[in-house]
Structures are given as C-alpha cells and as structure tokens.
Design a protein with these regions (language model features):
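Secretory targeting and sorting signals
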Residues: 1-18
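Contiguous segments within soluble domain cores/interaction surfaces
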Residues: 19-159, 169-170, 174-184
C-alpha cells in the first residue's frame, strides 16, 4: 500500500522547475529576424483561405498563416499609427483586432518589435505600453462571428515608421507575422 501511495504522489507532482504560471510555456525565445535599414519588408500576406468578409472582424482581413491573425485595418499588411491623444508622449498607435480560428482553443501570447530598427512594439497600457498581449480562452463577440472562434481588440503602439514583426505563440504553434507601419 505504501508503494502505491508513493507512486500516486509522484505521478501527481509537477516536474522540478515547472512553473505555476500558465503563460510561462508560451514565453519562447523570440525568432524575429533583423533587417538592414532600407531592406524590403517581407510583409505577411492575407490568408485567402478565410472569408474575411463573412467573418466581419474589425480591422478587415487578417494576415499570416494562422490560427491567430491580426486585422490591421484595411485589406493587407500595413498599419497606420496615429498620435497618442490619450496619454501623449512618443508612442503612436491604433486598434488591431486579433482573430483566433475555432480550431485553436488554447492561450495565445503575442510579442513584437521593429525589424529594421531598434524600436520596440507594445500593446495597450497607459503612458507606457505593455510588452506583450495575452489572449485568454474567452472572447468579445461580434456580428458574423464563426461558432467557436475568438477575438479581442487591442491597441498596438509604436514609436517610429518601419517594418515590424510579431511572434504569436500558442501551445501548438509559433508564428511570425510581419507588417509595415506608418507613424506620425
């Protein structure tokens, strides 16, 4: 009986070093390439497998391979940032809608930076933006939302025009999405 109790306890115990933070496993090393200043920006294309008109997300068409897509506004891989009228300072930004296909049900972690310069990219926040965006297992709802899909709006904030990339990490994937930004 004692051996069975010990084995049961070991089976339920977490491995050494396992984190209580459910987001820790999504904090993979960033694999965002650096570009030389003036190099062509390898913008991620719109995923044509998705009927973006029917899905009706704020932000138009999603770019990248999925299962998580940013809707940057318009129909492609360009984001127009506006001055930060709410908090002021050097950051500019705008609304981006993040669409999650019904085929993926887990958490999502998004981080990014400028690829052709030293500037960072942030999300939401106040005077200073947050360094990452977390998409939980719940969603806002919208007209045309496919059953089982999720999505959240966020503010994406930058300090300069250029070529930017975000790394989108889920439990079963890691994707990079690249887009251009025009900032004031």
């Amino acid at each position: 009986m004692t051996v069975v109790s010990v084995l049961a306890t070991l089976a339920l115990a977490q491995p050494l070093g396992a984190s209580q933070n459910p987001w820790a496993t999504l904090h993979r090393p960033l694999h965002l390439s650096r570009l030389a200043p003036g190099a062509a920006c390898p913008v991620s294309p719109v995923d044509r497998r998705i009927d973006w008109t029917r899905i009706n997300i704020f932000g138009g068409s999603g770019i990248g391979r999925g299962p998580v897509y940013p809707g940057l506004g318009g129909s492609g891989g360009h984001f127009d940032a506006r001055p930060d009228d709410q908090y002021g300072g050097p950051w500019a930004g705008g609304k981006v809608f993040w669409y999650v296909r019904p085929s993926y049900r887990g958490r999502v972690l998004i981080r990014g930076r400028r690829l052709d310069g030293p500037q960072s990219l942030g999300f939401n926040g106040r005077v200073l933006p947050d360094r990452e965006l977390r998409i939980h297992n719940y969603s806002v709802s919208w007209s045309g939302q496919p059953s089982g899909s999720r999505g959240i709006p966020s503010s994406v904030r930058v300090r300069a025009s250029g070529c930017y990339g975000v790394q989108i990490d889920g439990s079963t994937f890691s994707r990079v999405v690249v887009f251009t930004v025009t900032a004031p």
